[in-house]
Amino acid sequence: MNFIIPYYCDERLKYTQKYLKKAGYNEVFDKSEANFAVFAPACDKEMFKGYENVHVFYGVGDYDKKYKNCYDYNKRDDFKYKNAILTSEGAIALYKENSNKAIYGSNILITGFGKIGKSLCNVLKAMGSKLTICARSDIDKAQAKTIADNVIDFKALQCQNYDIIFNTVPAIYFTKNEIDTFKNDIKYIELASFPGGIDKHYAKIKNIDIIDGSKLPSRYSKISAGYLIGETIDKMIKEGKNWKSDIAWQAHFVHLAKQ
């Protein structure tokens, strides 16, 4: 089966290519010869022009709802789980680059207990931190209590005791009242997508350093992240189910996988 990577705009794709070739796929450079195309996790809608007749695997956006030939590997739970592990490793590396203090013994707050929050919680607790989880649902709170030292609700968010905050929630909970209680040397690491979790304007007034934690897998684990994309695409093609509702297209991919 032939594939094309038309835009090597993301270093991860170099390793996606290596994974796919090792898995038995053949890279071509003419889209008319390709069975499928691979786009980077973040791609622009303009990239899809000219690929209407090629199956396209990509990673961010709802293009799969608009275009019948598009498939989002980032919507798979197995991809999101493994990518969260890479993100949590990157978050710790990012902290170490911006601080001379150990994680061991530090008072740490993680806001949010999704896949990234859970992965980060496991790693930070194993490193000996004093860990508080701020979670929303009763299920998340119950799970967090099995790992963290303390679990709080967003309504009870207090910040005066923390050395480090890892935010994973794309909603602004850290406003003037919370920021005014921050320690002077606090490290705030933003892992959430826009708009983030903090009032950036007021944080700047208070000289709070917001450490940008975007795109951590590509920044710290580009090889593993690239292999993960390739592994996920390979699984999707071989399964031909549970990732696209159109039965005819599922059957077509099963046929391709057997070629």
Q: Where in the sequence are the language-model features?
A:
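NAD(P)-binding Rossmann-fold cofactor-contacting core
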Residues: 30, 127-147
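Residues at the starts of beta-strands that form the adenosine-phosphate
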Residues: 2, 26, 33, 107, ...
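Glycine/serine-rich phosphate-binding loop and adjoining beta1-alpha1 elements at the start
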Residues: 39-50, 54-105, 213, 232, ...
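A short, well-structured beta->alpha microelement
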Residues: 20-34, 44-47, 153-155
